[in-house]
UniProtKB/Swiss-Prot annotation:
Domain of life according to the entry: Bacteria
Cytoplasmic side: 1-33
Residue ranges annotated for the POTRA domain, each copy included: 54-122
Bilayer topology annotation: Single-pass type II membrane protein
Originating organism: Clostridium tetani (strain Massachusetts / E88)
Protein name: Cell division protein DivIB
Amino acid sequence: MRMELKMMGNVNKSNKTNEYILRRHKKKRKKKLIIFSILLISILVTLCFKHPFFNVKIVEVKDNKSIKKESIIKSSQISNENNIFYLNLNNVKNNIMSNPYILDAQIKRKLPNKIVIHIKERVALYYIEKDKKFYIIDNNGYVLEKKDNIKNMKLVRVDGIKKKDYNVGEPIFEQGNIRKNFMKNLASLIDKKDNNYEIAIVNIENMNNIQLKYRNIQIIIGDDEDLDKKLNKAFSILLQKEEIRGAKEGYINVSFKGNPVVFIK
């Protein structure tokens, strides 16, 4: 009787061991199946993404004003051989930003085969003349290009900057420079007016004696404090009095508080 019970115990123990082994084998097979499935899906997805269906067919440029769409697309170096998923958007942005007239570029994918480029442009407002060349400057003192002729470009000449070289794609001032801050402030005021208030020249050699030129009239600003109020005073006089606007020579001094001093010949 004891022998039979012992044998039955061994059988039960053996059955339990076999069940445990079977469960382990099942788990291993299941794990292998999951890994294989993931690998297969990954391969299929990769092959799918590399399919020509996802090659770039359309490049759309938005918010460009003065720069031609074709020029932006060319500088982006995007071709119809580029896969939309494998296209390096940072490289595309850097390529586009090599154009000095572009302040910023945002590139987005639009499935299945479209790239959208949003452009923010720099605006040409000033110029500096040196060695019979014209350096086009934006409101932040950034050199946009060098030209031999600026005919039909409504720009304000900047005098009084002493610098040996001007390099396209680089700023003419260091960050925080008082002249840079003034040019940016002036730009925000005159850019809102037709023809830039018709200001032809701004002289910033002496930042305590800033002067503007309107036709034949010199506008003496003094320092850059209360610039908007000083400009309003000067141009209120100019717009109200034809004899001043048409004078052969003269000046309006708004560098101090109180009524401006006006002199014409």
